[in-house]
Amino acid sequence: MLRPRTYVRKLAWRCPRKSQLGLRLATSVSSHKSLPLPMNFDISHSQSAFRAYQDIIHRNKSVGDDEPSQRSENENNPSESDKDSNQDPETPKKDKESENDKEPEKEKDIENDNKVSSESNENVTLASSNTGGAAPPNGNNNGDDPDDSNPSLPVDPVTGLYPPLLAIPMKDRPPLPGRPFAINVTDPEVIRSIYTIIDKREPYFVLFHVKDSNEPDTDVINKKDSVYDIGVHCQIIRHTTPRPGVFNVLGYPLERCKLEELTTPSSEKEAKSEEPSKEDAESFPTSYLKGLNVSYATVKPVEDEPYDKSSAEIRSLVESLKTLLSKMGGKNPLEKLQIKEGTDLISDPSKFADFVGSTIHGDPKKIQEILETLNIETRLSRALELLKVELKASLIKESTIHNLSTKADEYQTRLFIKEFIKELQKRAGISESEDKKTSKFDERLKHLKLTEEAMEAYNAEKAKMENQNEHSSELGVSERYLDWLTSIPWGVYSKDHFNIKQAREVLERDHYGLKDVKDRILEFISLGKVSGKVDGKILCLAGPPGTGKTSIAKSIAESLNRKYVRIAMGGIQDVHEVKGHRRTYVGSIPGRIISALKQAKTSNPLMLIDEIDKLDLSRGGGAASAFLEILDPEQNNSFVDNYIDVKVDLSKVLFVCTANYLGNIPAPLRDRMEIIDVSGYTNNEKIEIAKRHLIPEASKKAGLETNHVSITNETISRLIEKYCRESGLRNVKKLITRIFSKASLKIVEEIEAKEALDSSKEKEGVTASSEEANVNSESTKSNTSQAEPVAESSTDISTKSKVASEKIETKEKKETNKENGQSEEDQQPEPKFVIPEDIKLEITPANLKDYVGPEIYTRDRVYEFPPPGVATGLSYSTSGNGDALYIESILTHSIGSGSGVPGMHVTGSLKDVMKESASIAYSFTKSFMAKNYPDNRFFEAADIHVHCPDGAIPKDGPSAGISFTSSLVSLAINESLPPTVAMTGEITVTGRVLPVGGLREKILGAKRYGCDTIIFPKDIENELEEIPDEVKDGVTFIPVEWYQEVFDKIFPNATAQKCNEVWKEEFAKLDSKKKNKKK
């Protein structure tokens, strides 16, 4: 029994490749000869092939209904013997002889089948095109089957829908019908489904563009709203696996289609829960997609709107597209071939528009608009718009490439010419040393005295530079190194002037007071005059901000006739900022020291290391370690910068450092310095400095003379006492500058008001005179109208000629200024504003607040009559300012209530040392009271809270020890301390008073707060001798060694009986409460 070849081919497409039937069918299909198919196989192993065969028969019937033919009927309806064989597939064959007898008959049947097969295929293709499907392109399915024809899926005649097809989303630009495209699939389920539809010989799927490009990449459509409704119906041409897990599909868009219904994996799972019947599962041809975890969609073919090819609008658009496409071709043969292929489609405007949309690289959303456009004229217009943008971008790209190519050619030409000239000069023996970049460095060397090591480094780098190519990147590195090396003032020194008289005059001129500082500086200069040098000295000016440390360094430089350079240390945290970076780093430069020498242009300047206590030590102190070498006289004669990499002698440099707080400087670095204390100024010193320096400077900057604005001594004193209580003068300078600024404003407003008044009076006078002139002119009008013109006088002629010559000169000046690029306003400076001498302002204590605002310090003391438990201590801040520090102690609960817990807690941003000092004071006070006043049981029940005001300011140090003790003793005996007594000193648990620092500043702070008595440790009594009498005036000093001496001075009226019985009643109440509780 033989089957027609067409049916064999259909079965080969549907049959599993590994089965016996599939192998035989594939062999018979791939063979050019008609091979018989003996029915001796076990059909039970290939039931799917027979089901596929029945589907083919059913499909061919539906396709062939429109154009029936006898041959198609013969092909779709097998003979009765075939049916019998299908009903009984296991019927054995007859013997070989009967089979051989029918051999000629079989050959005839096969030849007829071949004819019928070809005609049937033509009929199927025609039918598919009539039902809305597009003819598939030529190609094969990955080489599995050489035959190119695939059965087209039918469109339901009632609904006009295709059966459900595999639906795949696409985030890239959507494809348009007629142009193949490629997609990568990574979802294993989708890959399995593609294999399935290929095996089923239904290699079709639908592709829809994703609306939101930010959605995660997926090969399954999870929501219908996530994709556009219009997509493309595609056929698989070829598929490959470029790498594991990636499946590449080459598809051919057949036609546009509209999404009607989408089934997602989630919706399919819900449907499965209802357990559909077997008939429902086989209700459509592609029902096998239900078993796969993919999305499939029911789509409807979309046809273009009717149009007229001969329409003028369409023809114009087509011609415009064709013209622009010819310009897009360029010089690329592949692009020319593609564009030629597209221009062949101009007879079909619809396909031509799709071709243009597929060719250009436009926005995916714009391409989707072309896909969704069914009006051909609109589609052509949108394609033309995108093509214009593409052409413009292409022209810009081409122009850019051309410009770059031209520049590269010019560069190569110049390079060739330079090298050619260089070679000619070399052949001719012409020296080119004058043209070398090293000539300027050689000129510098004539004025320098380089060390032997530096000269070797210079010669080596110079030779390296000469041998390098002109365009080498190393050339700039070598040139920059030689520039720095020759910028160091090797062997250049300024002559020192050791004139004590001149130095004293300079110091007195620039600074008032600071007698100790001036004496130390003059001693330093005198040592230099005796020894002939000042090498090896490192001075450190330590004191509060605004006390003139930087200006003192400038005065020293002027006195010695040395260059002055300043290096600010604020924020320096890296050693490379001091010693430079090595040349291996890109953009490396020398450190601050070499840069300062280059700026000074001498090897012995005065180098100010400003704010050395602000060095950042957070990175292990790298910068501080570098200064150990720089500021050590034994080492700085061979300082090596990382960039220069040559020893530089810094022993002739006079280093002067400034610091606000010496505690922030590392101890090894502090030991190398000679410390000079620059203490704060007294009020009298501030007044004199303001009169001598600050007021004249502020007056000059404001453009006012000192006789226009006068500030009395009382005003300056009030300004210092009520606004500026710090040790320095910076705030005083700011406020004086503000006074002159507001005074200038008031003076200008007063002058402008006067001028406005005068101008109004002048206008009134001019109006009156003009009225009189009008009356006189009317009276003489009749006489002058009949008079003959009189000849001009010689005076009038000379006046006119003078005016004319001035105009000519003015015109020439304007032309000259115009040629020089200067305007007339630039040539004429603004005239200085002249202030009349009768305008004067006087700044008095009464009107001072009109210029600087309300007073900051309204009273000298916080407590005029302090309550028990309040003591006045003295503090010394890191900025160098002395201040009063109040210690307040209270009882949180009354003694008689018995609700408090005996003990003490402290507040006020106290750090560890100060907390320990308070704890020591509490322990000593308990011991002191128990020893001297045993009947005073205060500490048995007292819950004490100790506080230091200004809680936002951190406080630390041991100097408040006796202040804590006095506050607790005052609370224990319930007696107040004198308001004008301040104290400072560290306390021990035995009552010994130990020395503290900053006595001078603390004295100034005590005086500012109205304290006239200061208790201090006896061990620092000798420091009083060094403090100026002006600071000590009006203050009584009480040196103490033990706390008992402090107690006797601050509580002179305290008796033993009073101190023992002060809390007697409260403890009686407490005892009675305790007894009642026991009962």
From Swiss-Prot:
List localization entries. Answer: Mitochondrion matrix
Q: Where is the composition biased (Polar residues)?
A: 117-131, 780-802
Q: Does the keyword Phosphoprotein apply?
A: no
Q: What is its EC number?
A: 3.4.21.53
Provide ranges: composition bias, Low complexity. 132-143, 768-779
Q: Which GO terms describe its molecular function?
A: ATP binding; ATP hydrolysis activity; ATP-dependent peptidase activity; sequence-specific DNA binding; serine-type endopeptidase activity; single-stranded DNA binding
Where does the record place the catalytic residues? 959, 1002
UniProt cross-references to PROSITE patterns, sorted A to Z: LON_N (PS51787), LON_PROTEOLYTIC (PS51786)
What is the extent of the transit peptide? 1-60
**Where does the Lon N-terminal domain start and stop, copy by copy?**
165-391
Highest taxon, organism lineage: Eukaryota
Top EC class, one word: hydrolase
* InterPro entries for this protein: AAA+_ATPase, ATPase_AAA_core, Lon_bac/euk-typ, Lon_lid, Lon_proteolytic, Lon_Prtase, Lon_prtase_N, Lon_prtase_N_sf
User: Might you report a single GO cellular component term?
Assistant: mitochondrial matrix
Domain annotation Lon proteolytic: ranges: 865-1053
Chief location: mitochondrion
Q: Which reaction does it catalyse?
A: Hydrolysis of proteins in presence of ATP
Q: What does this protein do?
A: ATP-dependent serine protease that mediates the selective degradation of misfolded, unassembled or oxidatively damaged polypeptides as well as certain short-lived regulatory proteins in the mitochondrial matrix. May also have a chaperone function in the assembly of inner membrane protein complexes. Participates in the regulation of mitochondrial gene expression and in the maintenance of the integrity of the mitochondrial genome. Binds to mitochondrial DNA in a site-specific manner.
Q: How does it assemble?
A: Homohexamer or homoheptamer. Organized in a ring with a central cavity.
Q: Which family does it belong to?
A: Belongs to the peptidase S16 family.
Quote the protein name from its UniProt record: Lon protease homolog, mitochondrial
Q: Which organism was this protein described from?
A: Debaryomyces hansenii (strain ATCC 36239 / CBS 767 / BCRC 21394 / JCM 1990 / NBRC 0083 / IGC 2968) (Yeast)
Task: List the gene name.
Answer: PIM1
